[in-house]
Amino acid sequence: RKETVIATKFGIVDESFFMGNEDALNSSRTSILQQVDASLKRLGTDYIDLYYQHRIDPKAEPEEVAETMQELIKAGKIRSWGVSFAPEDYIRRAHAVCKISAIENMYSFVARQDEETYFPLCEELGITYVSACPLAKGYLSNRYPAGTQYRKGDWRAEMNLFKKEGIDANRNLMDLIMEFAGRKRATPAQIALAWEITKKP
């Protein structure tokens, strides 16, 4: 166990959240305590190394969530905590109560806006930045050309990135990635990941 790092999440209590149901968000103290115990049982471990708040619950103040994280750390149930897709003000307020170890946001070759916002914030506060979807949901693998037919319910069918206009807009970037991949005898996904791990923080 000491050689394994386990990260998991709390805050989304029902999959209907992904269909627009915000009532499926619950980061109340009572719910978090139930969620962490359920995670520990499912994972077959007595502590979690990194416990992310999966999405911000508008009904829960950041200070309250951070206090609960502090409680879990003191109880030995988690070692550290992080937040996913949280605004800067939320991060600052929560961090002031209980140190946030990691934030997770969308970041890739085609989503670089955090370089001007969250990267400086992480450096200022000493927080690790974790990329969500470093391959842009598979787009940077170059396996989904224009005209690809997706199964019913596949979210890629609704994303501009995977539609003709998105593919056309990023054509020069993908051509460059493919050129580097050819030189290095690597896949485009490997090039995208190699680029990303050179970034900071």
Question: Language-model segments: which ranges?
Answer:
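Glycine-enriched alpha-helix->loop->beta-strand junction motifs that scaffold or abut catalytic
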Residues: 77, 95-102, 121-130, 200-201
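Helix C-cap/helix->beta junction micro-motif
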Residues: 2, 75-76, 125, 184
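N-terminal binding-site loop/beta-alpha segment at the start of enzyme catalytic domains
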Residues: 1-8
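Aromatic-lined glycan-binding groove of carbohydrate-active enzymes
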Residues: 114-154, 187
